[in-house]
Amino acid sequence: MFANSSANTTSTNSSVLQCPDYRDTHRLHMVVYSLVLATGLPLNALALWVFLRVLRVHSVVSVYMCNLAASDLLFTLSLPLRLSYYAQHHWPFPGFLCQTSGAIFQMNMYGSCLFLMLINVDRYAAIVHPLRLRHLRRPRVARRLCLGVWALILLFAVPAARVHSPSHCTYKNITVRLCFESFSDELWKGRLLPLLLLAEILGFLLPLAAVVYSSGRVFWTLARPDATQSQRRRKTVRLLLANLIIFLLCFVPYNSTLAVYGLLRANLVKNSIQDRDQVRGVLMIMVLLAGANCVLDPLVYYFSAEGFRNTLRNLGAPLNTRPLATNGAAGVLTELPSESTQNTGQDATSQVLLQPATLGTPPDNCSQDSAL
C-alpha cells in the first residue's frame, strides 16, 4: 500500500494530486517481472557467455544474437528497481534511477526489434539473394550495423529518460513518488507524443515491415519445387517463425496499444476518462508481454543454433568426454546456411557457402559468414 512508503515521503502541499490506485497493477507487475528476472537473468547471462567465450562470435547471425542477448541482459539487470517500486507503491530511489530504468526498457524493446530485423534480413540475403548481397554478410559489416543500432537506441534513450522523471501525488497526507506512470496531459500534448510516434516508426514499424517481408520472401523461395531440401532449411524456417512469433506476441500488442493510448492522452481522438482508463488497463498487461521477450529470445538461440545447443549440452558432460571446442569459425552454429534456389549457378554458389570454413580462413571471409 502507499502507506508503506511513509518513511520515504514528505509532507504534502495542496498542488499535488491525489494518488490513483495502482496497487492491483503493481501486484501483477511484481509477479510477472519476478518470473522474468528469475529466468531471463541466468538465461541471457549464459547465452552471452556462450557467444563470447565459447563460440567467439565469428558468424554474422551470432553477432546479432550476441547483441540481442546483451540488450536483454541489460533490461533484466534493471528489474530489481522496478520490483522494489511495485512492492512499495512508491519510488524510494533517486530520480535519475527512475529515468534510467524507464529508458532501459525502451532501449531493450526497440533494440530487440532492430536486432531481430537484422537476423531476418541476413537470412533473406543468404537465401533469396546469395550472390547480390553476399558483401553485406560479413562479421565486420554485422558489427558495424550493431554499433549503429546501439547508437540509435542510445540517442532515443536521452529524451526517453527526460520524460521518465518521477511524478508526485498524495496519499493520506503524505507525498508519494510515482515512476513509469501518471504522465501529465501537458507532457503528452508536448514532447511525449512526437517522441513516441518517431520511436514507433523507426523502432517498431520499420523492423516489423522488414521482418514480415523478409520472412515471406524466404518462405516463398524455400517452398519452390527446385528449393534445396535439407534439415538446415527447416531450421532456417524455424528461426524466422520464432522471430515472427516474438514480434506478434511481445511487440505488436504493446506498441499498438501504446499508440492508441498516446492519441487518447493527447486528445487527438475524442475520448472520455473511462476510455483512457480502459486502454491503460490493457496497456499495463501488454507491457508485460513486451518485457517477456528477454525470456523468449534465449529459446530462439537454443532451438535454432546447433552450436549453441551443443555447448549447453556439453556443459553437463564429464570433462574427458567433451568434444574439442571450436574457435567459432569451423563447424559452429552451422544451421542457418545460404541456400539458393533461384537458378543452377546460384545453387552451386550457395552450396559452396554451406561448407564450414577452414581454420585458416580469415574472419571476414564470406564462407565463414554463411553459418550462424
Swiss-Prot record:
Chief location: membrane
Molecular function as annotated in GO: G protein-coupled receptor activity
Family: Belongs to the G-protein coupled receptor 1 family.
Subcellular location: Cell membrane
Pfam family, one: 7tm_1
Protein name: Lysophosphatidic acid receptor 5
Its biological purpose: Receptor for lysophosphatidic acid (LPA), a mediator of diverse cellular activities.
Database matches in InterPro entries: GPCR_Rhodpsn (IPR000276), GPCR_Rhodpsn_7TM (IPR017452)
Domain of life: Eukaryota
Disulphide-bridged cysteine pairs: 98-179
Signal peptide, first to last residue: none
